[in-house]
């Protein structure tokens, strides 16, 4: 089941929270759900250059609070706050009732944000980058930024092939069944001349123990440190062949 289920939904209520936080009756539920989808679509299209990783919506009474997690919050706010005021007005036209408040949260390390990594790979593929190179470079950047592991999955007509297939790149460790594992999950779609390519990214940042994420990193061995300082590669000795009794 680890490969078949959404990692965010699998850990919902344990290490992950809800993107929409409100309560409604049977008559209003479908209407508010449609409004949330329209708000997310508007923000994602209008602020694509800001690197939007997550859009959270809270409703309490007549108040609607939209929290945007972005890699470049300056683009969301705009000069003198003009962009965010314009965005608030457009969201108010989508909401049936209530006042709208828009808050912006900055992502401290965009390189380990799975949605942003997936979007970056999609942009490179649409610019005709080699898909294997884009996947490997993205995985290396994630590991260099302090993640414990990353898995990149690309599916579709890769390289214009007649038959669709799936390519995977795995660096480090990415547990799928550990519920306390802090795994960030993101998807994106690359539109090419041969069709659409689906991109999935899973980033493992450590394990959540006592409400805090612990990296559980292994300390480097002394032999490894000496090899790094000397710049020598570890020698690989071949096992010596043992002669059997009675043999030549």
Curated annotation (Swiss-Prot):
SUPFAM superfamilies for the chain: Prokaryotic type KH domain (KH-domain type II), Ribosomal protein S3 C-terminal domain
Gene3D superfamilies associated with the record: 3.30.300.20, Ribosomal protein S3, C-terminal domain
CDD domains: KH-II_30S_S3
Pfam families: KH_2, Ribosomal_S3_C
Signal sequence, renumbered to the chain: none
Quaternary organization: Part of the 30S ribosomal subunit. Forms a tight complex with proteins S10 and S14.
Function statement: Binds the lower part of the 30S subunit head. Binds mRNA in the 70S ribosome, positioning it for translation.
Name this polypeptide is given: Small ribosomal subunit protein uS3
Organism: Deinococcus geothermalis (strain DSM 11300 / CIP 105573 / AG-3a)
């Amino acid at each position: 089941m680890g490969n078949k289920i959404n990692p965010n939904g699998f850990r919902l209520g344990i290490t992950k929270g809800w993107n929409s936080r409100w309560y409604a009756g049977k008559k209003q539920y479908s209407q508010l759900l449609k409004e949330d989808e329209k708000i997310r679509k508007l923000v994602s299209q209008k602020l694509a250059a800001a690197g939007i990783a997550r859009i959270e919506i809270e409703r309490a009474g007549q108040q609607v609070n939209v929290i945007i997690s972005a890699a470049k919050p300056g683009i969301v706010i705009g000069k003198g706050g003009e962009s965010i005021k314009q965005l608030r007005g457009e969201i108010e036209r989508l909401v049936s009732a209530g006042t709208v408040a828009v808050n912006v949260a900055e992502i401290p390390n965009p390189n380990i944000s799975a949605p942003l990594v997936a979007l970056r790979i999609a942009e490179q593929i649409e610019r005709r980058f080699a898909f294997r190179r884009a996947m490997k470079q993205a995985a290396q950047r994630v590991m260099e930024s302090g993640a414990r592991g990353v898995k990149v999955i690309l599916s579709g007509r890769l390289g214009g092939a007649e038959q669709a297939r799936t390519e995977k790149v795995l660096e480090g460790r990415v547990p799928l069944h550990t519920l306390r594992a802090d795994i960030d999950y993101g998807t994106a779609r690359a539109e090419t001349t041969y069709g659409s390519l689906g991109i999935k990214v899973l980033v493992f940042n450590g394990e959540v123990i006592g409400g805090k994420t612990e990296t559980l990193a292994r300390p480097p061995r002394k032999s490894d440190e000496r090899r790094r300082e000397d710049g020598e590669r570890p020698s690989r000795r071949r096992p010596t062949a043992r002669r059997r009794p009675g043999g030549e």
